[in-house]
Amino acid sequence: MADIFRTDKPLAVSPIKTGQPLGAILASLGIEHSIPLVHGAQGCSAFAKVFFIQHFHDPVPLQSTAMDPTSTIMGADGNIFTALDTLCQRNNPQAIVLLSTGLSEAQGSDISRVVRQFREEYPRHKGVAILTVNTPDFYGSMENGFSAVLESVIEQWVPPAPRPAQRNRRVNLLVSHLCSPGDIEWLRRCVEAFGLQPIILPDLAQSMDGHLAQGDFSPLTQGGTPLRQIEQMGQSLCSFAIGVSLHRASSLLAPRCRGEVIALPHLMTLERCDAFIHQLAKISGRAVPEWLERQRGQLQDAMIDCHMWLQGQRMAIAAEGDLLAAWCDFANSQGMQPGPLVAPTGHPSLRQLPVERVVPGDLEDLQTLLCAHPADLLVANSHARDLAEQFALPLVRAGFPLFDKLGEFRRVRQGYSGMRDTLFELANLIRERHHHLAHYRSPLRQNPESSLSTGGAYAAD
């Protein structure tokens, strides 16, 4: 059990923390034909949009209620009414995800009450589903905002009691922020390989996978989980929740569906991935496909090839709780040593990490820890690039945002293929970091210049 070591710093220097609204917006982008609506000042949404465009290198649908000083003091209910009415009329979305911010939460805005009042005054928009999520910036981090959207989706859109009909070939997949669009594509392929139909929430692989969509820019998400499938999640045969932060979401889903809810912290170890595949084979009644067995064999071969380079290497990690859990287990499974570890917040779930200490803090705290406890690798987002250069450490990019290399937002880390490629990446980084010593050349050597040019032969007098 890890000890959560809290510092007395009154400020954050080079923070790794991103607020709840960013996580909530990211989860909202995985719902089909929806649009996130941020209840706050224009700067709240503009800052988030810059982050997402840097990360995905694609336009992102996002709107704001544009609170100003007057509405902040006198009340901003009218801003919500105007924004919802405008979006429903102009964009015709299937769903709107209304998110609070630190500004609206400090004001005391009750967005659920405002939406109920909007339903009464604008009955013509009853066909548009509106989800309300409280995501204050001053509490938690991106991970909390992401999981809050999934919890609200289950509470507000999934029927409270399972329906009589059961779809025996359908499986629910709740995925946390640690799963990239590439990871979600791999999960979908695995489930479909067993003859099952997955409902993935949120399905970023359909909306934010970096595909070139037909037509002009759309103000709505192009792809994602259909609202109709979300409403039918209670009829599924089984459910998986991948991510420690989805514990409450899986607890909310359990009484709403007939099938079992299986919680997995991640799929970055052979044991966890085997458990996932075994459950799919069990509920489907089918044998494991040959391509999955081959990928497992490729992973085992990669473990043998990379063992001599990774054994005993120290891995420093600065990331959200779910990513810390995944990378710590991955490091231990490959004979590496995780630590030092820095998390953006001191969530109690960090105590379950298989290390001695976790520091809730920022990159300055990680810098201090690296001075006392050197590492061989650094796992963090792109903001840690300068820190990696300072300590001459290879940077393995993980988390959010990833803006200094193309394609990192969809890199596969989960599953057999993700672990295989990650092993090769880490081993190559360690090999490149190896510093070769220059050959000793005696100052008494005759004609050193000519000996270098002639392959070491001495010139005759």
From Swiss-Prot:
Record keywords: Metal-binding, Nitrogen fixation
Region (Disordered): 441-461
Composition bias, Polar residues: 444-454
Superkingdom of source: Bacteria
Pathway the protein takes part in: Cofactor biosynthesis; Fe-Mo cofactor biosynthesis
Pfam family, one: Oxidored_nitro
InterPro entries: ChlB/BchB/BchZ, Nase/OxRdtase_comp1, Nase_comp1_CS, Nase_Mo-Fe_CF
Alphabetized GO MF terms: metal ion binding; nitrogenase activity
UniProt xrefs under PANTHER family: LIGHT-INDEPENDENT PROTOCHLOROPHYLLIDE REDUCTASE SUBUNIT B
Protein name as it appears in the record: Nitrogenase iron-molybdenum cofactor biosynthesis protein NifN
